[in-house]
């Protein structure tokens, strides 16, 4: 393993085949030594820890996080105590309480956490999830009317509601009590109701802004137990052990792509440990439906196996399937729901492929992806609103800039869109501003993702508004769009032992990226194109030793073309992944970027 030298660009790569610079992830030398001494780490791992901003006094908690050390005081969240009091009041009074959840994994996980706590308290909590196509995102007056007609007295919204001031006002006007639990960006003035608990609420000093909604709900469960205990409700009985449900908190954190630091890292790390038992009937059934075997749970299970299938219900099927799956204790019901979600996921993939192909052709025909503008906005008639977010993410990866994809209903002229952003460009804030300026019918989100509703004849205005509003962030964001390398390795050193050494830094996500390794002047052997535009090959060093490698969705891009051409002389950056196919314990490199030394300036 080598250090890559002192060049301002790692291996001299000032422009890779994807247009990015390569840099060594910076780490302060004194901090590297401190981690080596305090934790007994080898230099490469200590350097990676320091490069992730982990202080000397944080190293032990980072590598072995615990809830005891990192759990925040629930009362540090604005309105948390009021929310706990209102919900426990309802449980004690036997009031009809319903949960209103968003239709993604975070919403489903949040709802399931509350359902399981209510069940442990001997109470029921019916779930309401709006239909993405007919109702759209978040609470509405019509939805609250429906809940009122069903006999609801208290409604708890999860993963939504913080920006639904008008809808919540309507709910209160018709006699409903409302508690909002959310994590999305919101206006200064919250909805007027019993409580608005939001880790990103202006004035909230919890310091937990990186939590998903499921993380906020998990803290709420602790507050509920505390309030119920204060009232003597656990005299002679055990309080619900909320640690059993950490797997649901981890699902929300991983699938909502939250920053895995501090308390949120502990939730996720310990949640994956709980998930590894596969005690939740819904998760176990969904894993089986996906054709995977139970075993130690990783972020990959949540983000790439379970999460897309749970989301499929909200994207192109029945929105409440995911929440019902995660809430049920009936193995047969779980199996039926899991099989339905797996089938919907297959259908979703085909719809996604069609929309992606159309969007790529439309944008690249006009050159909008390469005209220097900070944002790409692309629309199409009758593109399924359930897949526009996934497509936006694919195109963001392809063009390395924020992308908003809008599906327009050709009948009513209303577009529903979703956007994905780049680090350093706050798309949620820009969309919120567009809504407040009257450009949108609805809109909101967070830094890296946003959703919106817009009239078709306002899309051009939206494009101009976003480009103007985000232009100032573009230079800094482009500087951030670098491939940051943790270490230079030879193919012979890219082993299972190296993978397991750096796996101590898991779980990975925003604020704790997977280790990135660079291989210099490798020879590409056995290149082959795969279905889906993927490329597989072997990367060999001067001594002939090689490592398996795969590059996703790049066969038609310069990096993929260079790999398919084969031959020597390329530099490759990527992440090591476990390769346990057919019982072998190997590794393969998941390629992030490719550079040709003849083209790096």
Cite the ranges covered by each PLM segment.
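A generic local secondary-structure boundary/capping motif
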Residues: 168-169, 205-208, 293-295, 393-394, ...
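Hydrophobic helix-and-loop "lid/oligomerization" segment in the mid-to-C-terminal part
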Residues: 17, 25-31, 35-154, 174-175, ...
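Residues at the C-termini of beta-strands that transition into short coil/loop
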Residues: 131, 198-200, 407, 595
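N-terminal amphipathic/basic leader segments beginning at the initiator methionine
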Residues: 2-28
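Active-site cavity-forming subdomains of large catalytic enzyme subunits
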Residues: 145-214, 218-235
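Mid-to-C-terminal polyanion-binding domains and interfaces
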Residues: 15, 89-93, 333-378, 411-412, ...
């Amino acid at each position: 393993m080598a250090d890559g030298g002192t060049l301002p660009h790692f291996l001299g790569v000032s422009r890779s085949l994807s247009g990015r610079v390569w840099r060594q992830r910076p780490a302060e030398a004194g901090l590297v030594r401190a981690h080596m001494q305090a934790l007994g780490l080898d230099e490469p791992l200590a350097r990676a820890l320091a490069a992730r901003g982990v202080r000397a006094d944080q190293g032990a908690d980072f590598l072995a996080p615990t809830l005891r050390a990192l759990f925040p005081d629930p009362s540090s969240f604005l309105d948390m105590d009021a929310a706990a009091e209102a919900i426990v009041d309802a449980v004690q009074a036997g009031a009809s309480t319903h949960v209103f959840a968003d239709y993604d994994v975070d919403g489903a996980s949040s709802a399931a956490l509350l359902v399981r706590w209510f069940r442990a308290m001997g109470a029921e909590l019916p779930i309401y999830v709006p239909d993405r196509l007919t109702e759209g995102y978040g609470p509405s007056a019509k939805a609250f009317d429906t809940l009122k007609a069903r006999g609801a007295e208290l409604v708890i919204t999860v993963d939504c509601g913080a920006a639904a001031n008008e809808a919540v006002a309507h709910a209160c006007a018709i006699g409903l009590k409302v508690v909002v639990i959310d994590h999305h960006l919101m206006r200064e003035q919250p909805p007027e109701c019993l409580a608005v608990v939001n880790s990103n609420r202006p004035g909230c000093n919890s310091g937990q802004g990186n939590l998903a909604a499921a993380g906020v709900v998990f803290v709420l469960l602790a507050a509920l137990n505390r309030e119920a205990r204060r009232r003597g409700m656990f005299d002679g009985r055990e309080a619900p052990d909320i640690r059993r449900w950490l797997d649901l908190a981890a699902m929300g954190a991983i699938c909502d792509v939250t920053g895995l630091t501090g308390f949120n890292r502990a939730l996720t790390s310990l949640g994956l440990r709980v998930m590894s038992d596969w005690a939740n009937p819904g998760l176990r059934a969904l894993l089986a439906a996906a054709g995977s075997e139970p075993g130690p749970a990783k972020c990959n299970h949540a983000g790439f196996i379970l999460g897309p299938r749970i989301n499929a219900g909200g994207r192109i099927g029945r929105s409440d399937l995911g929440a019902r799956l995660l809430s049920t204790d009936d193995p047969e019901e779980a199996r039926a729901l899991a099989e339905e979600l797996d089938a919907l996921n297959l259908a979703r993939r085909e719809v996604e492929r069609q929309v992606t192909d159309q969007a790529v052709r439309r944008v690249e025909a006009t050159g909008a992806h390469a005209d220097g503008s900070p944002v790409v906005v692309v629309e199409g008639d009758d593109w399924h609103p359930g897949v526009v977010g996934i497509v936006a993410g694919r195109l963001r990866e392809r063009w390395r800039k924020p992308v908003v994809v809008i599906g327009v209903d050709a009948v009513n002229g209303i577009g529903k869109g979703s956007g994905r952003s780049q680090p350093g460009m706050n798309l949620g804030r820009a969309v919120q501003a567009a809504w407040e300026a009257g450009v949108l019918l609805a809109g909101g989100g967070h830094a890296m993702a946003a959703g919106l509703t817009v009239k078709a004849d306002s899309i051009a205005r939206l494009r101009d508004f976003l480009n103007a509003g985000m232009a100032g962030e573009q230079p800094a964001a482009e500087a951030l769009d670098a491939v940051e390398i943790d270490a230079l390795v030879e193919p012979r050193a890219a082993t299972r032992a190296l993978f397991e050494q750096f796996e101590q830094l898991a779980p990975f996500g925003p604020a704790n990226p997977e280790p990135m390794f660079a291989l210099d002047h490798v020879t590409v052997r056995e290149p082959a194109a795969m279905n889906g535009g993927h490329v597989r090959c072997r990367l060999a060093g001067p001594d002939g030793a090689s490592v398996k490698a795969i590059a996703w969705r790049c066969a038609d891009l310069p990096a993929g073309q260079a790999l398919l051409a084969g031959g020597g002389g390329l530099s490759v950056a990527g992440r090591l992944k476990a390769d346990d196919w057919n019982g072998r314990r190997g590794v393969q490199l998941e390629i992030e970027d490719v550079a040709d030394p003849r083209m790096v300036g």
